[in-house]
A protein has these predicted regions:
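N-terminal helix-cap/turn-to-beta initiation motif at the start of protein domains
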Residues: 13-24
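Short beta-strand segments that buttress and anchor functional surface loops
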Residues: 27-30, 83-89, 98, 111-116
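Mid-chain, structured segments of secreted extracytoplasmic proteins
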Residues: 58-99
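Short, cysteine-centered beta-strand-loop-beta hairpins and adjacent loop/turn segments enriched
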Residues: 32-38, 89-94, 117-124
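Short, solvent-exposed loop/hinge segments that bridge or flank secondary-structure elements
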Residues: 28-61, 65
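Edge beta-strand at a domain terminus
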Residues: 114-139
Length: 139
């Protein structure tokens, strides 16, 4: 999730053969924003069978911007890797790249890189490393 005045990015997925296990997932993220590293954040996420079976949709970016227009995200799935690219133009120009490696049906790693510019000036440079692991059934 991006912080500050950047649009809200919700990790949210239409995939081909790529699927993961439904259930309760522990998602750990570490963010470096403008050179400052945050402490790891750990969150739980319950994935339904529908969400787990449609990884490209579940993990695609969804943006909400004010005074900026976003193009539909371009995405590509190769083997067990999902990559996407989102661009928004307007008062805030945003360029976001995501790469998710689903190394097993119960584990993935990802990197999301975001650069935000206003009037051509870089105002936000964010890199988030993510690890997700299935920890059980949803409660």
């Amino acid at each position: 999730m991006l912080l500050c005045a950047l649009p809200v990015l919700i990790v949210s997925a239409e995939a081909s053969d790529l699927a993961i296990e439904p259930g309760d997932w522990k998602v750990t993220s570490t963010t470096v924003m403008n050179g400052a590293t945050s402490l790891p954040a750990v969150k739980g996420r319950c994935l339904t069978p529908e969400q787990a079976g449609d990884v490209a949709k579940t993990f695609a970016p969804v943006s909400g911007t004010v005074n900026s227009t976003c193009e539909p995200a371009a995405s590509e799935t190769t083997g067990r890797v999902l990559k996407w690219h989102l661009q928004c133009k307007g008062q805030l120009d945003l360029d976001v790249l995501g790469s998710f490696n689903f190394d097993s049906p119960s584990h993935y790693t990802a990197t999301v890189i975001s650069k935000g510019r206003m009037a051509g000036q870089l105002i936000s440079d964010v890199k988030t490393d993510i690890e997700g692991e299935r920890v059980g059934e949803c409660q």
